[in-house]
Every structure is written in C-alpha cells, then in structure tokens.
Amino acid sequence: MDVNIAPLRAWDDFFPGSDRFARPDFRDISKWNNRVVSNLLYYQTNYLVVAAMMISIVGFLSPFNMILGGIVVVLVFTGFVWAAHNKDVLRRMKKRYPTTFVMVVMLASYFLISMFGGVMVFVFGITFPLLLMFIHASLRLRNLKNKLENKMEGIGLKRTPMGIVLDALEQQEEGINRLTDYISKVKE
C-alpha cells in the first residue's frame, strides 16, 4: 500500500481556542495514550512543519552540531527498534512501557551527543519539538474528523509516515485488535 502524506490542517483547527484543549485524565493511561496517538496521526503534517521550522532555526545557528545530533538520534532509534524486534526482553519492554522506551532512546542519544559537546543543540533542536508535539497531542481534544481519519489509518485504508513510526513503536496494534474484536462481535 502506498504511503500518503496527511494534509496540512488549518491553523484554527490545529490551534483553536482554549475550549478545544483539556488536561488529560492521568488516571486512565490508555485513554490518554489513545488521544496522543490519534492526534499524532491527525496533525502529523502540522507537527512536521513546526518541527522543521524549529530544527531549521537551530540548524542555522549551529549546523554541525545539529547534523551530528540528528545522525546520533536516528542511529540510536534504529538500533533500539532493531534490538527490540530481535530481543524478546526489549520487545516486551517496548510494548508495555512505550514512554520508557522512547525516554531510553532519548537518554542514550543525549549521552552519545554529550561526548561530542552538542548537548544543548540536541536538547533544543531535536527534543524540544518532540516535547511540544507530545504536549499538544496530550492536550488537544479530538473532533469527529480526527476520529474518522484515525479509523481509516487503523484498518489500513490509509498509510501515513506517522502511522509507520507508530507501528514501529507498536502503538497502533492495540487499536487494530480492538477494532477487529468489535467487528467480529458485530458479525455474531
């Protein structure tokens, strides 16, 4: 199946008034995780544009350290994903504790970059856009169009870059399992 780039959402949809933002329910982690994953899929192009602008600004100010930081993060992330698919202990950790898995990748990247002296460039150029994406995805309430787009992605009618990344982190598999369970119950 071809990979489709999600459309750029309008600014007033991406960042509407305060009535479309709410604090997540920290007691219900699965609901919070569902909101984050749904928003990451729906607003992925907006997140990419914001991250590209921030990375470009930091990259303009310190190009060598920014390129070095990007290479280290990609290599560490690829190494952890490869290890998680080949080592059962890491695979279970990634499945049960996805936030911990991402934090370990970021910490490993931090320590590798600190050896090269580009820690601040890494922190502001790479992790700050990721932090902003996570905060927005956590606080932004979903709308009906968001939910519909996510169902299409979940059942495989659409394939997007963020969907591929979330599949690599095994964050969409649970939603697909719930959807197939629901469909089988409806058929009975």
Swiss-Prot record:
> What membrane topology term does the record carry?
Multi-pass membrane protein
> What processes does the entry annotate via GO biological process terms?
cellular response to oxidative stress; glutathione metabolic process; intrinsic apoptotic signaling pathway in response to oxidative stress; L-glutamate import across plasma membrane; L-glutamate transmembrane transport; learning or memory; negative regulation of L-glutamate import across plasma membrane; negative regulation of mitochondrial membrane potential
Which InterPro entries does UniProt cross-reference here? Answer: Prenylated_rab_accept_PRA1
Q: Which residues lie on this side of the membrane: Cytoplasmic?
A: 1-35, 78-93, 136-188
General function of this protein? Regulates intracellular concentrations of taurine and glutamate. Negatively modulates SLC1A1/EAAC1 glutamate transport activity by decreasing its affinity for glutamate in a PKC activity-dependent manner. Plays a role in the retention of SLC1A1/EAAC1 in the endoplasmic reticulum.
Respond yes or no to whether keyword Cytoplasm is given for this record.
yes
Name its species.
Homo sapiens
List UniProt keywords, sorted A-Z: Acetylation, Cell membrane, Cytoplasm, Cytoskeleton, Endoplasmic reticulum, Membrane, Transmembrane, Transmembrane helix
Induction comment:
By methyl-beta-cyclodextrin. Up-regulated upon induced differentiation and in heat stress.
Q: Which residues carry this modification: N-acetylmethionine?
A: M1
Its recorded name reads PRA1 family protein 3
Q: Which family does it belong to?
A: Belongs to the PRA1 family.
Compartment list: Endoplasmic reticulum membrane; Cell membrane; Cytoplasm; Cytoplasm, Cytoskeleton
Q: How does it assemble?
A: Homodimer. Heterodimer with ARL6IP1. Forms multimers. Interacts with ARL6. Interacts with prenylated RAB1A and RAB3A. Interacts with SLC1A1/EAAC1. Interacts with RTN2 (via first transmembrane domain). Does not interact with VAMP1, VAMP2 or VAMP3.
GO CC annotation: cytoskeleton; endoplasmic reticulum membrane; membrane; plasma membrane; presynaptic cytosol
What residue ranges are annotated as transmembrane?
36-56, 57-77, 94-114, 115-135
The record's region (Targeting to endoplasmic reticulum membrane) falls at 136-188
Where is the segment annotated Required for homodimer formation and heterodimer formation with ARL6IP1?
A: 103-117
Is the NADP keyword given for this protein?
A: no
